[in-house]
Amino acid sequence: MATSDIQIDNKRTRVTRWSFEVGEDTGQHIHEYDYVVVPMEDGQLKIVDQDGTVLISDLIKGKSYYRNKGVNHNVINHNDFPFSFVEIEFK
């Protein structure tokens, strides 16, 4: 299982660094808040949504992306090396 390190958690935001060893995942989860992800290195994540649809997402170090709340998925490290990103949630 991927590890999460909550760096900031206040009434407006939660900032979490997610770290994955090869093949580790977050487990299926639903996002309660809108959020931004900032990859800490180049790599790929395998995203499996609630109906089993699989997407391979190519990420670039430092290139952020935004998603709306309600996303329901499992995130898996699809690389042959450890991978991490910072997730910023807007409460």
Model-derived regions, located:
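Catalytic phosphate/metal-binding cores of nucleic-acid and nucleotide-processing enzymes, i.e., regions
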Residues: A2, R12
